Design a protein with these regions (language model features):
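Anion-binding and metal-coordination hotspots
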Residues: 1-294
Protein backbone atom coordinates (compact mmCIF):
# COMPACT_ATOMS: atom_id res chain seq x y z
CA UNK A 1 0.00 0.00 0.00
CA UNK A 2 1.02 3.66 -0.32
CA UNK A 3 1.97 5.41 2.92
CA UNK A 4 1.45 9.00 4.00
CA UNK A 5 5.18 9.63 3.78
CA UNK A 6 5.03 9.06 0.03
CA UNK A 7 2.26 11.61 -0.35
CA UNK A 8 3.82 14.31 1.81
CA UNK A 9 7.29 13.85 0.33
CA UNK A 10 6.06 14.85 -3.12
CA UNK A 11 8.19 12.13 -4.68
CA UNK A 12 5.27 10.07 -5.90
CA UNK A 13 3.68 6.88 -4.64
CA UNK A 14 5.67 3.81 -3.75
CA UNK A 15 4.31 0.42 -2.79
CA UNK A 16 5.10 -0.83 0.71
CA UNK A 17 4.18 -3.84 2.80
CA UNK A 18 2.07 -2.02 5.37
CA UNK A 19 -0.76 -2.44 7.84
CA UNK A 20 -3.83 -0.34 8.56
CA UNK A 21 -4.02 0.38 12.29
CA UNK A 22 -7.37 1.54 13.76
CA UNK A 23 -8.09 2.77 17.29
CA UNK A 24 -11.26 3.26 19.31
CA UNK A 25 -10.61 5.83 22.04
CA UNK A 26 -12.84 7.11 24.84
CA UNK A 27 -11.71 9.92 27.15
CA UNK A 28 -8.09 9.37 26.19
CA UNK A 29 -8.13 5.60 26.91
CA UNK A 30 -7.72 3.07 24.10
CA UNK A 31 -10.65 0.66 24.35
CA UNK A 32 -10.06 -1.36 21.20
CA UNK A 33 -7.69 -1.71 18.28
CA UNK A 34 -7.94 -3.28 14.84
CA UNK A 35 -5.22 -4.25 12.39
CA UNK A 36 -5.83 -5.10 8.74
CA UNK A 37 -4.24 -4.65 5.33
CA UNK A 38 -7.02 -2.69 3.63
CA UNK A 39 -5.69 0.31 1.75
CA UNK A 40 -8.50 2.64 2.84
CA UNK A 41 -10.57 3.10 5.97
CA UNK A 42 -14.00 2.76 4.35
CA UNK A 43 -14.09 -1.04 4.48
CA UNK A 44 -12.63 -1.34 7.99
CA UNK A 45 -15.39 0.18 10.12
CA UNK A 46 -17.84 -2.74 10.04
CA UNK A 47 -15.29 -5.46 10.97
CA UNK A 48 -13.81 -3.06 13.56
CA UNK A 49 -17.16 -2.50 15.30
CA UNK A 50 -18.04 -6.19 14.97
CA UNK A 51 -14.83 -7.18 16.74
CA UNK A 52 -15.58 -4.60 19.45
CA UNK A 53 -19.03 -6.14 19.91
CA UNK A 54 -17.65 -9.68 20.09
CA UNK A 55 -15.20 -8.57 22.80
CA UNK A 56 -17.46 -6.37 24.96
CA UNK A 57 -20.90 -7.74 24.09
CA UNK A 58 -22.31 -4.38 22.96
CA UNK A 59 -21.75 -1.61 20.45
CA UNK A 60 -20.64 1.93 21.37
CA UNK A 61 -23.51 4.31 22.15
CA UNK A 62 -21.97 7.08 20.07
CA UNK A 63 -19.41 7.03 17.29
CA UNK A 64 -17.47 9.90 15.75
CA UNK A 65 -15.19 9.26 12.78
CA UNK A 66 -13.62 11.23 9.95
CA UNK A 67 -14.84 11.45 6.38
CA UNK A 68 -12.96 8.33 5.29
CA UNK A 69 -15.71 6.20 6.85
CA UNK A 70 -18.77 7.98 5.41
CA UNK A 71 -20.04 5.31 3.01
CA UNK A 72 -23.62 4.07 2.69
CA UNK A 73 -22.82 0.60 4.05
CA UNK A 74 -21.10 2.08 7.12
CA UNK A 75 -23.94 4.48 7.88
CA UNK A 76 -26.51 1.71 7.39
CA UNK A 77 -24.61 -0.61 9.74
CA UNK A 78 -24.27 2.07 12.41
CA UNK A 79 -27.96 2.99 12.39
CA UNK A 80 -29.08 -0.66 12.24
CA UNK A 81 -27.18 -1.27 15.49
CA UNK A 82 -28.61 1.82 17.25
CA UNK A 83 -25.30 3.69 17.34
CA UNK A 84 -25.69 7.46 17.46
CA UNK A 85 -23.62 8.41 14.43
CA UNK A 86 -21.35 11.43 14.08
CA UNK A 87 -19.44 10.20 11.01
CA UNK A 88 -18.31 12.98 8.72
CA UNK A 89 -19.54 12.80 5.15
CA UNK A 90 -17.12 12.34 2.25
CA UNK A 91 -17.50 16.02 1.29
CA UNK A 92 -17.50 17.39 4.83
CA UNK A 93 -14.63 19.83 4.30
CA UNK A 94 -16.33 21.25 1.20
CA UNK A 95 -19.62 21.55 3.07
CA UNK A 96 -17.99 23.63 5.81
CA UNK A 97 -16.28 25.91 3.28
CA UNK A 98 -19.44 26.38 1.19
CA UNK A 99 -17.80 24.94 -1.94
CA UNK A 100 -19.90 21.79 -2.07
CA UNK A 101 -23.15 21.86 -4.04
CA UNK A 102 -25.80 19.20 -3.68
CA UNK A 103 -26.48 18.32 -7.32
CA UNK A 104 -29.75 16.58 -6.50
CA UNK A 105 -32.27 16.05 -3.73
CA UNK A 106 -35.16 13.72 -2.97
CA UNK A 107 -38.67 14.82 -2.08
CA UNK A 108 -41.03 13.08 0.35
CA UNK A 109 -42.07 10.63 -2.39
CA UNK A 110 -38.44 9.64 -3.10
CA UNK A 111 -38.45 11.43 -6.45
CA UNK A 112 -35.06 12.80 -7.45
CA UNK A 113 -34.75 16.42 -8.59
CA UNK A 114 -31.60 17.92 -10.07
CA UNK A 115 -30.05 21.29 -9.30
CA UNK A 116 -32.28 22.89 -11.94
CA UNK A 117 -35.33 21.35 -10.21
CA UNK A 118 -36.07 18.84 -12.98
CA UNK A 119 -37.48 15.48 -11.91
CA UNK A 120 -35.43 12.44 -12.91
CA UNK A 121 -36.56 9.19 -14.46
CA UNK A 122 -35.64 6.09 -12.47
CA UNK A 123 -33.97 3.39 -14.58
CA UNK A 124 -33.35 -0.29 -13.96
CA UNK A 125 -30.24 -0.18 -16.14
CA UNK A 126 -28.35 2.34 -18.27
CA UNK A 127 -26.49 1.40 -21.47
CA UNK A 128 -26.26 -2.21 -20.36
CA UNK A 129 -24.95 -1.30 -16.91
CA UNK A 130 -26.84 -2.37 -13.83
CA UNK A 131 -26.62 -0.28 -10.64
CA UNK A 132 -24.26 -1.36 -7.89
CA UNK A 133 -25.86 -3.01 -4.86
CA UNK A 134 -28.87 -1.12 -3.54
CA UNK A 135 -28.28 1.88 -5.79
CA UNK A 136 -30.46 2.98 -8.72
CA UNK A 137 -29.95 5.01 -11.88
CA UNK A 138 -31.75 8.36 -12.23
CA UNK A 139 -31.78 10.02 -15.66
CA UNK A 140 -32.06 13.78 -16.26
CA UNK A 141 -32.69 14.57 -19.95
CA UNK A 142 -32.47 17.72 -22.09
CA UNK A 143 -29.58 19.37 -20.26
CA UNK A 144 -28.28 21.36 -23.26
CA UNK A 145 -29.75 24.67 -22.03
CA UNK A 146 -29.22 24.17 -18.31
CA UNK A 147 -27.29 27.03 -16.71
CA UNK A 148 -25.77 24.67 -14.13
CA UNK A 149 -24.28 22.39 -16.76
CA UNK A 150 -20.70 23.49 -16.11
CA UNK A 151 -21.05 22.61 -12.42
CA UNK A 152 -23.11 19.46 -12.77
CA UNK A 153 -21.02 17.83 -15.49
CA UNK A 154 -17.53 19.07 -14.66
CA UNK A 155 -16.54 15.64 -13.31
CA UNK A 156 -17.60 13.87 -16.51
CA UNK A 157 -15.16 13.01 -19.29
CA UNK A 158 -17.38 14.63 -21.93
CA UNK A 159 -20.24 17.11 -21.82
CA UNK A 160 -23.57 15.49 -22.64
CA UNK A 161 -27.19 16.55 -22.96
CA UNK A 162 -28.19 14.25 -20.15
CA UNK A 163 -26.98 13.39 -16.68
CA UNK A 164 -27.29 10.09 -14.85
CA UNK A 165 -27.00 9.83 -11.07
CA UNK A 166 -26.32 6.48 -9.43
CA UNK A 167 -27.56 6.90 -5.89
CA UNK A 168 -29.92 5.65 -3.21
CA UNK A 169 -32.72 7.51 -1.46
CA UNK A 170 -31.96 5.69 1.82
CA UNK A 171 -28.34 6.84 1.63
CA UNK A 172 -29.51 10.40 1.01
CA UNK A 173 -31.77 10.37 4.10
CA UNK A 174 -29.07 8.76 6.27
CA UNK A 175 -26.56 11.31 5.04
CA UNK A 176 -28.87 14.23 5.87
CA UNK A 177 -29.57 12.80 9.33
CA UNK A 178 -25.85 12.35 9.92
CA UNK A 179 -25.13 15.95 8.86
CA UNK A 180 -27.77 17.20 11.31
CA UNK A 181 -26.12 15.18 14.08
CA UNK A 182 -22.72 16.66 13.25
CA UNK A 183 -24.05 20.23 13.32
CA UNK A 184 -25.83 19.78 16.67
CA UNK A 185 -24.18 20.85 19.96
CA UNK A 186 -23.48 17.19 20.74
CA UNK A 187 -21.95 16.79 17.30
CA UNK A 188 -19.64 19.75 17.89
CA UNK A 189 -18.64 18.20 21.22
CA UNK A 190 -17.92 14.84 19.60
CA UNK A 191 -15.89 16.38 16.77
CA UNK A 192 -13.73 18.41 19.14
CA UNK A 193 -13.03 15.38 21.33
CA UNK A 194 -12.27 13.12 18.37
CA UNK A 195 -9.61 15.55 17.14
CA UNK A 196 -7.90 15.71 20.54
CA UNK A 197 -8.34 12.11 21.69
CA UNK A 198 -7.91 9.87 18.65
CA UNK A 199 -5.38 12.02 16.83
CA UNK A 200 -3.73 12.70 20.18
CA UNK A 201 -3.38 8.97 20.88
CA UNK A 202 -1.70 8.41 17.53
CA UNK A 203 0.53 11.42 18.19
CA UNK A 204 1.67 10.06 21.56
CA UNK A 205 2.38 6.63 20.09
CA UNK A 206 4.36 8.03 17.17
CA UNK A 207 6.13 10.96 18.83
CA UNK A 208 6.41 10.32 22.58
CA UNK A 209 6.72 6.53 22.36
CA UNK A 210 8.78 6.76 19.14
CA UNK A 211 6.82 3.96 17.48
CA UNK A 212 6.41 4.34 13.73
CA UNK A 213 7.29 0.91 12.36
CA UNK A 214 6.21 -2.63 13.24
CA UNK A 215 8.96 -5.13 14.02
CA UNK A 216 7.07 -8.31 13.13
CA UNK A 217 5.58 -9.86 10.00
CA UNK A 218 2.21 -11.45 9.47
CA UNK A 219 -1.19 -10.12 10.50
CA UNK A 220 -1.35 -12.18 13.74
CA UNK A 221 2.12 -11.17 14.89
CA UNK A 222 1.52 -7.52 14.01
CA UNK A 223 -1.81 -7.58 15.90
CA UNK A 224 -0.03 -8.94 18.98
CA UNK A 225 2.60 -6.21 18.70
CA UNK A 226 -0.03 -3.47 18.35
CA UNK A 227 -1.84 -4.91 21.39
CA UNK A 228 1.34 -4.48 23.47
CA UNK A 229 1.77 -0.93 22.18
CA UNK A 230 -1.82 -0.02 23.15
CA UNK A 231 -1.35 -1.69 26.54
CA UNK A 232 1.79 0.35 27.13
CA UNK A 233 -0.06 3.51 26.11
CA UNK A 234 -2.88 2.83 28.59
CA UNK A 235 -0.45 1.99 31.44
CA UNK A 236 1.45 5.19 30.72
CA UNK A 237 -1.83 7.13 30.74
CA UNK A 238 -2.91 5.47 34.01
CA UNK A 239 0.30 6.42 35.84
CA UNK A 240 0.03 10.00 34.58
CA UNK A 241 -3.55 10.14 35.88
CA UNK A 242 -2.56 8.73 39.29
CA UNK A 243 0.32 11.19 39.60
CA UNK A 244 -1.92 14.13 38.70
CA UNK A 245 0.12 15.01 35.62
CA UNK A 246 -2.77 14.25 33.28
CA UNK A 247 -6.55 14.17 33.28
CA UNK A 248 -9.25 12.44 31.31
CA UNK A 249 -9.48 14.28 28.03
CA UNK A 250 -13.11 15.16 27.35
CA UNK A 251 -14.47 18.58 26.47
CA UNK A 252 -18.12 19.11 27.39
CA UNK A 253 -20.06 21.53 25.21
CA UNK A 254 -21.62 24.51 27.07
CA UNK A 255 -25.34 24.33 27.71
CA UNK A 256 -25.99 27.49 25.68
CA UNK A 257 -24.00 26.28 22.65
CA UNK A 258 -26.03 26.74 19.47
CA UNK A 259 -26.17 24.32 16.56
CA UNK A 260 -23.77 25.03 13.72
CA UNK A 261 -25.11 25.89 10.27
CA UNK A 262 -23.54 25.24 6.89
CA UNK A 263 -22.84 28.19 4.59
CA UNK A 264 -25.11 28.43 1.56
CA UNK A 265 -23.08 27.94 -1.65
CA UNK A 266 -23.05 30.95 -3.96
CA UNK A 267 -24.07 29.44 -7.29
CA UNK A 268 -23.34 32.58 -9.30
CA UNK A 269 -19.85 32.78 -7.86
CA UNK A 270 -19.20 29.11 -8.61
CA UNK A 271 -20.48 29.53 -12.17
CA UNK A 272 -18.08 32.43 -12.71
CA UNK A 273 -15.24 30.37 -11.25
CA UNK A 274 -15.97 27.50 -13.63
CA UNK A 275 -16.03 29.85 -16.60
CA UNK A 276 -12.64 31.29 -15.60
CA UNK A 277 -11.16 27.80 -15.37
CA UNK A 278 -11.62 27.37 -19.09
CA UNK A 279 -8.76 29.81 -19.54
CA UNK A 280 -7.87 32.37 -22.16
CA UNK A 281 -6.82 29.78 -24.74
CA UNK A 282 -10.20 28.05 -24.62
CA UNK A 283 -12.03 31.31 -25.32
CA UNK A 284 -9.61 32.11 -28.16
CA UNK A 285 -10.20 28.71 -29.73
CA UNK A 286 -13.95 29.22 -29.52
CA UNK A 287 -13.78 32.66 -31.15
CA UNK A 288 -11.43 31.33 -33.86
CA UNK A 289 -13.82 28.50 -34.74
CA UNK A 290 -16.70 30.98 -34.81
CA UNK A 291 -14.86 33.30 -37.24
CA UNK A 292 -13.72 30.39 -39.38
CA UNK A 293 -17.29 29.15 -39.63
CA UNK A 294 -18.36 32.49 -41.03
Amino acid sequence: MCLKEDYYSGLGSNMHAGYNFQLLVSKGIILHYFVCQDRNDMTTLIPFLSSFNSLYGFFPKRLCADSGYGSFSNLQFVYDNNIHSFIKTLDWASLLSGDSIQLFHFDENNNLFCLNNKMAQKLDYYFGRHPHGKYSFYLISYCHRCKFKSICQKSLKSIKNERVFETNSDFYSLRQLNINNLLSPKGIEMRVNRSSQVEGAFGVIKQDMDYERVRRKGIDNVSAEIMLVCLGYNIRKLFLLLSGKAKLDYWVAPIDLQSESLPIPNLNKLLKTESKKKGKNASLRTSYKHKKGR
